[in-house]
Amino acid sequence: MTSPLPNVNTAQTEPPASVSFWQAFGFWLKLGFISFGGPAGQIAIMHEELVVRRRWLSEKRFLHALNYCMVLPGPEAQQLATYIGWLMHKTRGGIVAGVLFVLPSLFLLIALSWIYIAYGQVAWVAGLFYGIKPAVTAIVIQAAHRIGSRALKNNLLLAIAAASFVAIFALNVPFPLIVLAAALIGFVGGRMRPEFFSAGGGHAASQANFGTALINDDTPTPSHAVFSFKRLMQVLLSGFVLWALPMGYLVTQNGWDHTFTQMSWFFTKAALLTFGGAYAVLPYVYQGAVEQFGWITATQMIDGLALGETTPGPLIMVVAFVGFVGGYVKAVLGPDSLFLAGALAAMLVTWFTFLPSFIFILAGGPFVESTHNDLKFTAPLTAITAAVVGVIVNLALFFGYHTLWPQGFTGSLDIPSALIAVAAAVALLKFKLNVMHVIGVCGLLGICLQYGLK
């Protein structure tokens, strides 16, 4: 990605040559290994590669797809890759694009989770996480600021964000109820006062012109992307079978209360609630994985997010860490198969977390294209996105508390951690430094502190 960008004033008028399935396969495989930087960075990479350099689709078609991926629960960057793959090469193109977006990070996280759980007490590893944890707190604060600055366009949306914060922080209201309440407010409010809900968290169209694209603004919708009730039923039935078969096997073989079964059911629910991306669903994962089931500890949850920030792929892949640690610590396959238990748990939760995203795109792609700019459809999203801001602020406080006061408020403030957190926040918010660079520097500081260079 070092070639110069096209000059928008001298855009090419001829579309590029048609792209074969295997050419696209090569790109999606590459993307799976370079998709660092969270959803914003991943979407930027796809925009540069697919719109600017390769011209596989136009700016308008790209943003149209992105806006509707934002409507759906689930990781929007992975869904966008699935959507574009589907638009270009039908169902198999969508499946390949979505799977390759996730697969490298799954294997990396299984390996890193094993190193973490097996060697986490080694001095340099402990020091690395000591430095990264405060950086993660700053990253979550940055996420709240970024989403809030885009989503809270008026006082009503600000009030929704404040109410969601109070609900989850002070009243411990479950995250699903917060999402439902926000959606209802948006649904009703979009009819009563539409002006308050027309400035939601979508992505505005750009006037940039990078040349004629393979799928251009006026390119007719491919036949496979035209809505068909029969095709919709086929996709929904196939998706249900792909969910029901492994779930049924787990229930019949292990019982409903087995760790594998509970993980599969819990992360199925989590997949349907990830409006606003990974940061929005993490409080729900925390409520279940830490407080309800005890699969991991609060400290491990923070460490898992740190690992998720440093690997390619969707940030929601932190669920693979939760699954691995839970399966490993619970020794669900016995004391002699700890790694296998962790790896199977990681793969299970990844399957049940991402399966709904594929169903949403393959089944709903034709439908959501027909609802472009329909306020009845987008107003609930606007309200949910506002509520997500309050939830993320709560998440930042949760991480800050456990990082800066490791013994609770009765103990003393961890001054080095506080200084690292402040420095990371300044680097991210004021100087707009790369997240990976900030994490790397903070990790090195943690190692130095661990070895006594205070």
What function would you assign to each model-found segment?
Residues M1-L72, E76, Y83-T311, L315-K454:
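Multi-pass membrane proteins that catalyze or facilitate reactions on polyprenyl-/lipid-phosphate substrates
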